[in-house]
Amino acid sequence: MDLKQLYREVIMDHYKNPKNKGLKKTDPYHLVHLTNPSCGDDMRVEIYVDHGQVVDVRQDGIGCSICLSSASVMSDLLIGKSVEEAQKIVQDFYSMVKGEELEDEEKLGEAIAYKGVRELPARIKCATLAWKCVEKAMNEVEDHE
């Protein structure tokens, strides 16, 4: 099996069997809702941060397989990380999908499956929508601490 096929399988697995799907809609969760008007993707991400640690990330949305699977991968990857680590992972993900080289791709875990999105510029917004939600949520939570 080649690498592209493996990446496709990761994407489809997270699309069909999403992790951390469903919102809590209660404190201490912080919700951010963003949309991609160019394609109709609609994403909600909740984050629970306690003492600088990402305790939980929940996600729910409507969209294409790239958008929804990316949300699943992102939520699974960031749980248990410090906010600082999570913010670095988000920035590394953005860099990767834009085609920039990374020092340590392994930190992205299964998110590396979206590396090929750089070849599909119209899909970059799909892949990054949930990541933009969690980035905004972390920034808003930090502002309130």
Residue ranges and their predicted role:
Residues 1-145:
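Domain-level signature for proteins that mediate thiol-based redox and metal-cofactor handling
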